[in-house]
C-alpha cells in the first residue's frame, strides 16, 4: 500500500492507495467499532460497491446507514444536499457520526460540504471511485455544490479525516470518465512537474490500459503534488490557484452547456488549451510547448477545442463570476512552460476572445 500524508498540523490526514482496499477494515481509518457512519453514494455505484464497503465497515463493528443519490453533475445541488441532511436527522445521526463519500467528484464535493455544515461540522472520509476524484477533488478539502449561475459557488474548505483510493474501481470506469480524470493528471505535469509530463508522454498507453503499476505511480505522484500545494496554501490565497489551470474557461463551458453535458475533465482539457493559447498570444509560452500539451491531451482522448456553437462572447460572463476574480478584474492561470505556470491579472478581454477563437471547432 502507498501512503501519503497531507500535512496540516492537527488536521493532517492520510491518503491510502492500493488494490483491494474496499475489503480491508483498516482502510477506513479512523472509523472504529461502535461508531456510527452514513455511507453515501449514487445509484450507479451502489450496484457495484455499496454492499462490499458496507460489509467491511460492519465487520469492523461500525453501525452503517446508507443514502443513495441520483447520478450526475446536475444533482450536485442544494436540493440534493437537503436530502442528505434529512436522512441524517431522520436516522438520529449526531455530531459523532462520520460521513463516508463513496463516489466521484460530485459525491465527494457534496458530502464534504454536508459534513462541513451538519451540526456545524462532522467527520468525513473520502472514498473516490473515479480517476479525477482520486488525483484531484478528494484531496485538499474543497467542498461545494453548484448554483445555476456558477459551478462550486456554494461551499467551504473542509478537510477529510482520510482518503481511501482503491484502484480496482477504475476497472468499471467508462473510458470517457477515465479520460476526464487524465485531464487533471496532465494538468499537474503542465503546472508543476516537467519530468512527470514526460513520463505521461511515454506511459499514456499504459494508463489507458489500466496497468496497475502505472496507475499507482500516476495517482501517487498527483496526490504528492496536490498534498504539497495544499500544505503550503490550504485556502487558495497563493500557489494553490495554479491548480485551476483551464478551470476558468472550463467552468464557463460547463455552465453554458448545462452541467453534465461536458464532463468536468473534458471542459478542463479544452480550457487548458485556451489558457495555453492566451499565453502564446502574450508571449509567455512557446507555441511548440502548447503543441506538446495538445498532443498529450488528444492521446488521452480529450477535446482540445471548445463546444461547437459556443462563441467567444459566451465565455466571458461566466469567467467574470470566477472565484479568482478580484475587484472585477479577470485573473487567469497561464502556463509559461511545461512544468510551470503563473497567475496573471488584467489580461485583455480581446486577447481572451481571440484565444478562445483559436480553440473553436
Swiss-Prot record:
The protein's enzyme class: lyase
Q: How is the cofactor bound?
A: Binds 1 divalent metal cation per subunit. Can use either Co(2+) or Zn(2+).
- Span of the signal peptide: none
Catalysis: reaction(s)? 7-phospho-2-dehydro-3-deoxy-D-arabino-heptonate = 3-dehydroquinate + phosphate
Q: Which InterPro entries match?
A: Dehydroquinate_synthase, DHQ_synth_AroB, DHQ_synth_fam, DHQS/DOIS_N, DHQS_C
Query: Where is it mostly found?
Result: cytoplasm
Gene Ontology CC terms, in alphabetical order:
cytoplasm
Q: Name one GO molecular function term.
A: 3-dehydroquinate synthase activity
Keywords associated with the record: Amino-acid biosynthesis, Aromatic amino acid biosynthesis, Cobalt, Cytoplasm, Lyase, Metal-binding, NAD, Nucleotide-binding, Zinc
Q: An example of a Gene Ontology BP annotation on this entry?
A: chorismate biosynthetic process
Which Pfam families does the entry mention?
DHQ_synthase (PF01761), DHQS_C (PF24621)
Q: Recorded E.C. number(s)? A: 4.2.3.4
Residues annotated as binding Zn(2+) are 184, 247, 264
Q: Does the keyword Zinc apply?
A: yes
Q: Which pathway or pathways does this protein act in?
A: Metabolic intermediate biosynthesis; chorismate biosynthesis; chorismate from D-erythrose 4-phosphate and phosphoenolpyruvate: step 2/7
Role summary: Catalyzes the conversion of 3-deoxy-D-arabino-heptulosonate 7-phosphate (DAHP) to dehydroquinate (DHQ).
NCBIfam families found in the cross-reference section: aroB
Q: What is this protein called?
A: 3-dehydroquinate synthase
Q: Which organism is it from?
A: Edwardsiella ictaluri (strain 93-146)
